[in-house]
Amino acid sequence: MPPSEKDQLANTFRDTIKILDYFEREIGVPYPWDKYYNACAIDYMWGGMENTSLTTLTTRTLFTDATENLRSSRGLDAHEVAHQWFGDLVTCRDWSHLWLNEGFATYYSLLYDREVLGNDYFKHGLHGNARGIFGNDKDIIPIVHQGYSNPSQQFSFRAYPKGGWVLHMLRSELGEDLFRKCVKTYLERHQYKTVVTQDLVEIFEELSGRSLSQFFDQWVYLSGYPEIKINYAWDELTKQVKLSINQV
């Protein structure tokens, strides 16, 4: 990066150490490398790339004190740090399982938001990701699929926000403690190896004692989203609303 912009590094990466500390606590697996650096490159075409222990980022993420209340690199920083576990320590075997890298990084960056900014901000982030998913409601391709002609096609809403939402639903279904235990086991058992989605499924089923085939079939291996029917009834006597939601 230009020497003239080096003073912006402290603003841009003010959260990096806190992110590393939080992920070690939340994931339960120590940071797996000897060091961690951020390097900003001029004319870098992507937002960031999670090279093991050395993330490369665009200089567009740099900012000064004058704009610190208008912008933040926290989300990108947390996303790339999360990849040190999900993408570097353990990585997808082929592009069809990219969500195992990007979905986890997307979700864990939101978990860091919850840690530092609270649950309402976390929910706001989830809502924003959901809007990104439903903006592609005509899409008929599942998260895991091999019908792509170029790997770049896999870097889509399916791997990022939809993958993150699948993890959030699974965490909500199983509870935070069990989810955390499953993720820790997944990383420890497959560290320095490549994985497919079934490797993740097997660990969640083993530790939960439940079959999750319906969950993963519906949300990962099949496309679209569920259609629901909502029934609304007002009880004048009790002044209460009876609301029922059923999947069609």
Where are these regions (language model features)?
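Hydrophobic alpha-helical and helix-loop surface patches within well-folded domains
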Residues: 1-246
